[in-house]
Amino acid sequence: MSVPTFDDLSFYSNDQELTKSRYLKLVEIFQSNFPNASIDFFARSPGRVNLIGDHIDYNFFPVLPMAISADVIVAVNVNDEPEIVITHTDSKNFAKETIPLTNNNDGFEIDSQHHSWANYFKCALIVANNYLTEQNLKGQLKGMKLTFDGNVPTGGGLSSSAAFCVASTLAILHANGVKDITKADLTRITVVCEHYVGVNTGGMDQCASVYGEPDKALLIQFKPKLIGKPFKFPVENLTFVITNSLQVSNKHETAPIHYNLRVVEMAIAADVLVKKLNLGTLVPQDSNIGTSSLRGVMDAVFNTCKWDGNDIDVGIDQLKKMIAIVETELNNNQEGYTVDQCLTVLDLSLDEFKSKYLQAYPVKFDVLKLYQRAKHVYQESLRVLETLKLLSTTQTSSNSKDDDESFLVKFGELMNQSQSDLDKLNESSNDKLNKICSIALQNGSYGSRITGAGWGGSIVHLTTLDKSKQLIQGLIKNYYQLEFPSIKLDELLNDAIIDSKPSMGSCIVTTKFLQ
């Protein structure tokens, strides 16, 4: 399935006139930035919200996100100049940057100490150039003039960085002659984009951004291969309200104590289980840092009947057994493992430990909470499959109001359980985020949970069309106006609160609609 190309904006599910006005404003700013250049095409990719299944994608367990209407758009001019110039409609926060091109298409060095938005574009340049080489399309990269526009909140947990990287990669490839790329290939090459800026992403964000379809959510699987499978919800008046807590979560700057530390803790937890269960070489070293993964541990435990990712009942049974194993093998050290305790269990020297776990990405910690992290991964993965089972059983029943209400209550409870684990086991929530969830549940939400990396960012709320207004008003009154008394209502409704249907994924847009 290829990334689509559209000649108009009819694929947008939100206000068509508002959308066209946004594109026309982008054209106006592009022409102001580059008066002697014309736009050849647009590339775009949306943000995403994860409905359930956080901090499990990099352990290769399936997740359930959807693409949202908020997206990153880039207007592109292709030329033969030896440079790429990137600009943004928000020039105050994203200043103009020029990236010189060399004959060898190298030199895209990323200064991890300099947190510039150009670093993310360079990530896209690296993966796009690698793909061109892989496809035997190696040649001098085209010069480009680009103006970006994005309405995915930065640091809001809605994958603004993934949307930017995917849109940038798609633009670079299209400019350099790749007019037809599969969704699978675009996902595969962009999954590693943010690794170049030191953020250890797992693949869900990029896959959801690429594979999104209108009115459909996505089951994203990582084994046996990375793929997105669209599906519809059985309740017609179901909707999701996404609220930005306005606590900015900068993954790059906080990664050593948050996101990357979870990756390391889960990797060590997997290796500790390998040792305790005597699994030896049955577990592949396939994590992002070259260690065992918690999915690999489960597959090794059930080596003769590995879960294929499709049979929901088998997956549920195996995950329940893995939760019991975690309770048996790791529960005796809930306060956390010291490095010395890890060395003893893993039979490693300090230098070997540092080389294996602490070299790939910087982390800071006092103790490593292996029990909590492993338990979260297996319980959260179980909830994803329980949601799938709920979807499959509801879709085969009648569509009465009682059935709809039953589905909403059950799915909401799974989301609430997820939030509890994210708070207590993964420790990626905080008091203010918990407060938002509590307020929402009192004002029409069936289930509310943080989404994305956490530690700030956004909350996703399950509700219905007839309750969404009450929910939004309750959050404005009891959270936003108390925490941010000077904030304007129109700013909230435009930037902090999104009521989004599942939306179209990555695509190219021609300039025909401008004619």
From Swiss-Prot:
The keyword DNA-binding does not apply. It comes from the Eukaryota. GO terms for cellular component: cytosol. GO terms for biological process: galactose metabolic process. It catalyses: alpha-D-galactose + ATP = alpha-D-galactose 1-phosphate + ADP + H(+). One of its GO terms (molecular function) is galactokinase activity. SUPFAM superfamilies: GHMP Kinase, C-terminal domain, Ribosomal protein S5 domain 2-like. Coiled coil: none annotated. ATP binds at G155, G157, S159, S160, S249, N250, K251. InterPro entries: Galactokinase, Galactokinase_CS, GalKase_N, GHMP_kinase_C_dom, GHMP_kinase_C_sf, GHMP_kinase_N_dom, GHMP_knse_ATP-bd_CS, Mevalonate/galactokinase. The keyword Transferase applies. The active site is at D205 (proton acceptor). Pathway: Carbohydrate metabolism; galactose metabolism. Its EC number is 2.7.1.6. The record marks R48 as: Transition state stabilizer. Alpha-D-galactose binds at R48, D54, H55, D57, D205, Y259. Keywords: ATP-binding, Carbohydrate metabolism, Galactose metabolism, Kinase, Nucleotide-binding, Transferase. Signal peptide: none annotated. Pfam families: GalKase_gal_bdg, GHMP_kinases_C, GHMP_kinases_N. PANTHER family: GALACTOKINASE-RELATED, MEVALONATE KINASE/GALACTOKINASE. Galactokinase is a key enzyme in the galactose metabolism where it catalyzes the conversion of alpha-D-galactose to galactose 1-phosphate. Can also induce the transcription of the gal genes in response to the organism being challenged with galactose as the sole source of carbon. Belongs to the GHMP kinase family. GalK subfamily. This is Galactokinase. The gene is GAL1.
